[in-house]
Swiss-Prot record:
Domain notes: The expected RING-type zinc finger domain is highly divergent and most of the expected Cys residues are not conserved. Still, the protein is required for CTLH complex E3 ubiquitin-protein transferase activity. In addition, the conserved Cys-314 in this highly divergent region is required for ubiquitination by the yeast GID complex, suggesting a direct role in catalyzing ubiquitination.
Subcellular location: Cytoplasm; Nucleus, Nucleoplasm; Nucleus matrix; Cell membrane
Protein source organism: Homo sapiens
Superkingdom of origin organism: Eukaryota
Presence of the UniProt keyword Aminoacyl-tRNA synthetase in the record: no
Protein name per the record: E3 ubiquitin-protein transferase MAEA
Coiled-coil zones: none
Gene Ontology molecular functions: actin binding; ubiquitin protein ligase activity; zinc ion binding
Reactions accelerated catalytically: S-ubiquitinyl-[E2 ubiquitin-conjugating enzyme]-L-cysteine + [acceptor protein]-L-lysine = [E2 ubiquitin-conjugating enzyme]-L-cysteine + N(6)-ubiquitinyl-[acceptor protein]-L-lysine
Record site feature (Essential for ubiquitin ligase activity), residues: C314
């Protein structure tokens, strides 16, 4: 029974925390497989065409030179097919080995050796930190941490570095790199109903207007917006209205379209689609884990205005995490536990809660430890009471 519960907990942990660890390399493998299939099918069709042409030529009385030329063409196409097949298989093999490496790493979680389990947990923490740093844009720090911890094969650095190139190009107000990324992932972006490529084409149109290249803008619109429909058609109509206004217009909505802040919106849109493409959440696993941990121990006592009930051992009570945990829900506790303010021990039948005349409750063992001459001093109010005045508290 315990083994089944442990397996169930591990399965839940993998689904919640380790999903990106396996999903990203799997999606990469899937993408490379589809690309390899297309490349091999295309090159095979080329070989088939030149072979058919050779057979057609041989059915007559061809000259030797023409046959040699056709044979050279067949050899060339076969060489290209072989090269493309080898490259595709190598790329697939790399992705498959990466998936296997990560699966083997996750299996180490159930090790019976405490030392091995401790090392695995440390690596998991490092992996979370690397991903969080990558999301925050600290690429060099993330790469150094991954290299130092020996987890380069266990984190999705390549995906984030590719995203970095795209984002940097958008910051330079260039669309070519992002459009190339859209082309590489065209089929999946279409299934996601992504509007990123359309937004990029709109921005290119806006930049042509900004440069006062209106004829080029019209040609651009005819080329890329002829198939627009629905909400996209409304955006096209709005953008086309810019042709009648100067680049420095103060009339809305054309002033808003010319706002350079649109490039920042494109970066945000790219990030959103990139995460969706790899089935990642908008927040890092580190952020989600930290929030879950803070919420699990957050109580109303952590936010008392006088600060008298705050515990130095409570992470939520600390200054650095108190504000971060403020919007999070309180801990769910089906059965309450009373904790002594003096010792931090749980008050139960072996350490019954005792109430002083001023209404403050402490554990019996703690009152014994601070009793002097049959008197106790309340740590909160500094009032002095006889030990016999403390009354046992009963919880219904």
């Amino acid at each position: 029974m315990a083994v089944q519960e442990s397996a169930a907990q591990l399965s839940m942990t993998l689904k919640v925390q380790e999903y990106p660890t396996l999903k990203v390399p799997y999606e990469t493998l899937n993408k490379r497989f589809r690309a390899a299939q297309k490349n091999i099918d295309r090159e095979t069709s080329h070989v088939t065409m030149v072979v058919a042409e050779l057979e057609k030529t041989l059915s007559g009385c061809p000259a030797v030179d023409s046959v040699v030329s056709l044979l050279d063409g067949v050899v060339e196409k076969l060489s290209v097919l072989k090269r493309k097949a080898v490259e595709s298989i190598q790329a697939e093999d790399e992705s498959a080995k990466l998936c296997k490496r990560r699966i083997e790493h996750l299996k180490e979680h159930s090790s019976d050796q405490p030392a091995a389990a401790s090392v695995w947990k440390r690596k998991r923490m490092d992996r979370m930190m690397v991903e969080h740093l990558l999301r925050c844009g600290y690429y060099n720090t993330a790469v150094k941490l991954a290299r130092q911890s020996g987890i380069e094969d266990l984190v999705n650095i390549e995906m984030f570095l590719t995203a970095k190139e795209v984002e940097e190009s958008l910051e330079r107000r260039e669309t070519a790199t992002c459009l190339a990324w859209c082309h590489d992932n065209k089929s999946r972006l279409r299934k996601m109903k992504s509007c990123l490529e359309f937004s990029l084409r709109i921005q290119e149109f806006i930049e042509l207007i900004r440069q006062n290249k209106r004829l080029d803008a019209v040609r651009h619109a005819r080329k890329h917006f002829s198939q627009a429909e629905g909400s996209q058609l409304d955006e096209v109509r709005q953008a086309m209205g810019m042709l009648a206004f100067p680049p420095d217009t103060h009339i809305s909505p054309y002033k808003d379209l010319l706002d350079p802040a649109r490039w920042r919106m494109l970066i945000q849109q790219f990030r959103y689609d990139n995460y969706r493409l790899h089935q990642l959440g908008n927040n890092s696993v580190f952020t989600l884990t930290l929030q879950a941990g803070l919420s699990a121990i957050k109580t109303p006592q952590c936010y008392k205005e006088d600060g008298s009930s705050k515990s130095p051992d409570c992470p939520v009570c600390s200054r650095s995490l108190n504000k971060l945990a403020q919007p999070l829900p309180m801990a769910h506790c089906a059965n309450s536990r009373l904790v002594c303010k003096i010792s931090g021990d749980v008050m139960n039948e072996n350490n019954p809660p005792m109430m002083l005349p001023n209404g403050y409750v402490y554990g019996y063992n703690s009152l014994l430890s601070i009793r002097q001459d049959d008197k106790v001093v309340c740590p909160r109010t500094k009032e002095v009471f006889h030990f016999s005045q403390a009354e046992k508290v009963y919880i219904m």
